[in-house]
Swiss-Prot record:
Gene Ontology annotations of biological process type: queuosine biosynthetic process; tRNA wobble guanine modification; tRNA-guanine transglycosylation
Record bears the keyword tRNA processing: yes
Species the sequence originates in: Lawsonia intracellularis (strain PHE/MN1-00)
NCBIfam families the UniProt entry points to: Q_tRNA_tgt, tgt_general
Keywords: Glycosyltransferase, Metal-binding, Queuosine biosynthesis, Transferase, tRNA processing, Zinc
Lineage: Bacteria, Pseudomonadati, Thermodesulfobacteriota, Desulfovibrionia, Desulfovibrionales
Name of the protein in question: Queuine tRNA-ribosyltransferase
UniProt superkingdom: Bacteria
Extent of the signal sequence: none
Swiss-Prot/TrEMBL catalytic activity: 7-aminomethyl-7-carbaguanine + guanosine(34) in tRNA = 7-aminomethyl-7-carbaguanosine(34) in tRNA + guanine
């Protein structure tokens, strides 16, 4: 077994690549989609369900787990893997995005951020060092540094000041957790808003800190899709080829494939589970809204090309009935299917990269979602 942080590229097709990332709780094959388990669980999904659909890594959120039930409580239980019975790798976001989304409930300063809990209004302080301590208590395999995610309409002056702060925090994070300190990996986060020059500066300064991997943050925050993709394709090639690259909070199946095309390895998004709970399901024929009346007597599975438990067991008519009856089982079955679809998109991408036909594979998916 290679030491945590080892990353091997196994195949390339243009900038798209497959690889293997080693962590303390096992390997992660890339590209990979990470189901979001904000408070330690993927909504409506049990660990056995995740195993069954071949999920390799999930995401948790430092902010939410710190507030409830508390990182020290989780540490006393043996860490997040023991607490939530998920034995495979876990990545924890620093909570920066959630804190900065609080706007009126937080105050920024050089040392960190003061914020009030969205739960009970209690006052808390996150410093770069504190965020690392919390994540080490959680014992996540991949930790993220504290950063500020600016709004899409932030001007150059504010964005430049914000980037200086984010880099300052990244340096302090690296100081408190030097390379080789432990088995937890630490990723830096590229920021810089909508400005290429600032993102280039961010990449350069983060590379000097020699993180175990690099995330592209601050995209899909309200900017037009064309600008998001332009910044993605501009930023990703600047990151070290020998380290994993993570596009935070993005996105649709097509967004993910475009990210892979740009050379990104890791993705997370709440979209598959959130849409599942709203009745929107992804299939090999495009999106399907199970709430529609046309499915009331439809005995077909959601997707005849899908091997997930939901599709192999239940009809569209039954799933529609569950949804309209407000049965909680609908959330689980729909989520199993949507997560399976997203992971199958990833598995197909890996196969296409190895086979040298990734561009054609991406075009096939594009036809489903651009009509």
């Amino acid at each position: 077994m290679n030491p945590p942080g080892t990353f091997h590229i196994t195949a390339t097709d243009g900038s798209a690549r497959t690889g293997v990332l080693y962590t303390a709780h096992g390997i992660v094959n890339t590209p990979i989609f990470m189901p979001v388990g904000t408070v330690g669980s993927v909504k409506a999904i049990a660990p056995d369900d995740l195993e069954a659909i071949s999920a390799e890594i999930i995401l948790g959120n430092t902010y939410h787990l710190y507030l409830r039930p508390g990182d020290e409580l989780i540490a006393r239980r043996g860490g997040l893997h023991v607490f939530n019975a998920w034995e495979k790798p876990i990545l924890t976001d620093s909570g920066g995005f959630q804190i900065f989304s609080l706007s009126s409930l937080r105050k920024l300063h050089k040392d960190g951020v003061i914020f009030r809990s969205h739960i009970d209004g209690s006052k808390h302080v996150f410093t770069p060092e504190r965020v690392i301590t919390i994540q080490r208590n959680l014992n996540s395999d991949i930790m993220m540094v504290l950063d500020e995610c600016v709004a899409a309409n932030a001007d150059y002056t504010y964005t430049a000041q914000s980037l200086d702060l984010t880099i300052h925090w990244a340096k302090r994070s690296r100081d408190v957790y030097p390379k080789g300190e432990g088995d937890n990996l630490l990723f830096g986060i590229v920021q810089g808003g909508m400005f290429k020059s600032l993102r280039h500066s961010s990449v350069s300064q983060l590379i000097d800190l020699d993180f175990d991997g690099y995330a592209i943050g601050g995209l899909s925050v309200g900017e037009p899709k064309e600008i998001m993709m332009e910044l993605l394709y501009d930023t990703a090639p600047l990151l070290p080829k020998t380290k994993p690259r993570y596009l935070m909070g993005v996105g649709t199946p097509l967004d993910i494939l475009k990210g892979i095309e740009a050379g990104v390895d890791m993705f997370d998004c709440v979209l598959p589970t959130r849409n599942a709970r709203n009745g929107t399901l992804y299939t090999s024929q495009g999106k399907l809204n199970i709430k529609r009346k046309e499915y009331a007597e439809d005995d077909l599975p959601l997707d005849e090309n899908c091997s997930c438990y939901t599709c192999q067991t239940f009809s569209r008519a039954y799933l529609r009935h569950l949804f309209h009856s407000q049965e909680l089982l609908a959330f689980r079955l729909n989520s199993i299917h949507n997560l399976t679809y997203f992971l199958n998109i990833i598995f197909g991408a890996r196969k296409a990269i190895h086979g040298g036909y990734f561009f054609n594979y991406k075009q096939q998916v594009e036809q489903l979602y651009c009509n």
